[in-house]
Amino acid sequence: MDFWKFFPFLALSTIWVLCLASSLQAAPFRSALESSLDLGTLGDQEKHLLLAALMQDYEQMKARKLEQEEQETKGSRVTAQKRSCNTATCVTHRLADLLSRSGGVLKDNFVPTDVGSEAFGRRRRRDLQA
């Protein structure tokens, strides 16, 4: 008796497999990557719609990537910041650098400031050898 309950299922599945096999022989399955899109057959409006869809997908992908990067940076407590020095020595060095890099009429007459390690006002280290 179990055979007669199973027989209709077996018959229907066999018919389905045969239909599927015959349809694959008639038109072979091609993946989306294998099929090439011929832009010559598309009209102007279809080309514009395709371009708009591609741009929208690209923008969404970039937005998701930016959101993901923002979430990653929010999660980390350590932020990479350049340390700045605001002491008089650092400011003097920056100003001297700016003046030396800036060109202009006064460049020929410009005398560089003495901002080295032996500049006026700096403590001189005593030699330990003496």
Swiss-Prot record:
Propeptide residue interval(s): 27-82, 127-130
Entry-annotated residues carrying Phenylalanine amide: 120
Signal peptide start and end residues: 1-26
Tissue: Detected in nerve cells of cerebrum, hippocampus and pons/midbrain in newborns, and only in nerve cells of pons/midbrain in adult.
Recorded GO MF terms: hormone activity
Gene Ontology CC: extracellular region
UniProt xrefs under Gene3D superfamilies: 6.10.250.2190
InterPro entries found in the cross-reference section: Calcitonin-like, Calcitonin/adrenomedullin, Calcitonin_CS, Calcitonin_gene-rel_peptide, Calcitonin_peptide-like
UniProt entry keywords in alphabetical sequence: Amidation, Cleavage on pair of basic residues, Disulfide bond, Hormone, Secreted, Signal
Disulfide feature: 85-90
Chief location category: secreted
Keyword Plastid among record annotations: no
Keyword Repeat: no
Compartment annotation: Secreted
Biological role: CALCB/CGRP2 is a peptide hormone that induces vasodilation mediated by the CALCRL-RAMP1 receptor complex. Dilates a variety of vessels including the coronary, cerebral and systemic vasculature. Its abundance in the CNS also points toward a neurotransmitter or neuromodulator role.
Membership in a protein family: Belongs to the calcitonin family.
Protein name in UniProt: Calcitonin gene-related peptide 2
Name of the coding gene: Calcb
